[in-house]
Regions:
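Short beta-strand segments
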Residues: 9-12, 89, 120
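Conserved "HGTGT" condensation-loop signature of ketosynthase/thiolase-family condensing enzymes
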Residues: 1-84, 106-108
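Conserved catalytic cysteine-centered active-site region
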Residues: 41-46, 50-62, 91-139
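Short glycine-rich or small-residue beta-strand-to-loop segments that form or flank ligand, phosphate
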Residues: 85-91
Length: 139
């Protein structure tokens, strides 16, 4: 699918400080690894995952998303008052209702008439949200 009037202006992210590496996990599982005769480094080799990151307990997805949104907005000249839609594509939500996107919308001080909603579809939620907005622009 190709879009004619759509492009990605900016991306933002916010990584948690708590890091647990595959090596850390393997050290914790050392006795099990020995019993099973598994070589050290097996976890990363099999999964391709070098590290995992975790937020502190009590941190809400909207807080992290708002920081990522500010990061993205800080890298562009787009006036936030011209943003007409915000979709939260995360699996994680603050609550069942209201939509997590509504909290992010408030935190980012977007226009009151901007469309806001959540799309949750595992790893594809973000991509689904991007395609949905692109269709709203181009179709």
């Amino acid at each position: 699918m190709r879009f004619e009037n759509v492009y990605i202006e900016s991306l933002g992210y916010h990584l948690p400080d708590n890091v647990v590496t595959s090596e850390d996990l393997e050290r914790r599982l050392a006795s099990l690894y020995e019993k099973l005769k598994l070589p050290f480094g097996r976890l990363e080799m099999m999964s391709g995952i070098r590290e995992r990151r975790f937020f502190e307990k009590g941190v809400f997805p909207s807080q992290v998303s708002s920081l990522a949104g500010e990061h993205a907005l800080g890298k562009t000249d787009v006036d936030r008052q011209h943003i007409g839609c915000l979709i939260s594509g995360s699996v994680c939500r603050d609550f069942l209702e209201p939509a997590t996107a509504s909290i992010i919308h408030h935190n980012l001080k977007l226009p009151t008439d901007a469309l806001v909603f959540d799309i949750s579809n595992a790893c594809l939620g973000v991509l689904n949200g991007m395609v949905h907005v692109a269709n709203m622009i181009d179709l």
